[in-house]
Amino acid sequence: MSSIPVIELSSRAREIFQLVVESYLGSGLPVGSKTLARQGVNLSPASIRYVLQELETKGLLLSPHISAGRMPTELGLRLFVNGMMQLSEPSEEERSAIEADVIRGHSPKERLVNATTTLSGLSACAGLVLVPKQELVLKQLGFVVLDDNRALAIIVGSDGSVENRVIELSSGFPASALTEASNYINAHFSGYSFSEAKKRLFSQIDLERSELDSAASDLIKRGLAVWSEDSRKRPVLIVRGQSHLLQDASEDLDRAKQLLEELEDKKEIAGLLEKVSESDAAQIFIGSENKLFSLSGSSVIASPYHGEDGHMVGVVAVIGPTRLNYGRIVPMVDFTAKTLSRIIA
């Protein structure tokens, strides 16, 4: 979590500040002295107003209108999150829902999608999962003729994923060479990553060239080469629940539109979430603390999940307005990350 300047608060100011933040996060409305008095603050309204003014001077609160109450600034939210937030673990029902939906997936990607969708629904935020894409391990590869000059290379990965690429064929390319090439690849390279397969390919194919049709030999080389290094290592970002960001749009339509635009910049989001990989616990980015979401004034709560060997595999996160129930959502994101670590690993 981000560090903040040392801010000295009296016990009275600390109590009032915490009440203001908790009330604001619950209602989304500025908090005034009368509201605080009703919550049991044992001070006169005038004394409460004095403390509120003091907190505003320190940059922890602001007043959106002259006659309105106070609401926390980003600095105030950071102070609250770092030292005053009361964490509330997910309920048994919430934990069961997350675990059941992750287990229900038939492939790693489907499990990640399910986790993202469930987390989004429970938090009423947009849910994200970042997967630094691992090099694909070949299970099976086949070719399908599209027309006289093109074939579709279809690869099935060991994780159940399926990818397609179009390969150009020379005029009169024999259909038998497609079958011969796919049979050779599946017999010799199943269970290998593409970089490993390429190394084996050039050491083996010369020895066995006499047993292979020249067209099949050429197709084998291109069939393995078509999956480029860049495409294999491009991170995958799954986003679900964008509709939750529009629920309060009637109050702040411009902010919601801005956030939806920011969510389209998947490369920048991936860069932000990759920073989380250096930590074992949930990280919180509030408003302008991250450049990407500074215009919309949004918060990101993200936590890494790990593989069997303990290395970071990906990051799960939620994005929403800065007025989030941090105490509830932070443990929920952490639990989802731990569930993914346990089940997917």
Curated annotation (Swiss-Prot):
GO biological process, one term: negative regulation of DNA-templated transcription
Keyword Iron-sulfur in annotation: no
GO molecular function: DNA binding
Presence of the UniProt keyword DNA repair in the record: no
Domain of life: Bacteria
Keywords of the record: Repressor, Stress response, Transcription, Transcription regulation
Cross-referenced NCBIfam families: hrcA (TIGR00331)
Role noted for this protein: Negative regulator of class I heat shock genes (grpE-dnaK-dnaJ and groELS operons). Prevents heat-shock induction of these operons.
Entry similarity comment: Belongs to the HrcA family.
HAMAP family to which the protein is assigned, alphabetical: HrcA
Protein name as it appears in the record: Heat-inducible transcription repressor HrcA
Species of provenance: Zymomonas mobilis subsp. mobilis (strain ATCC 31821 / ZM4 / CP4)
Protein's gene: hrcA
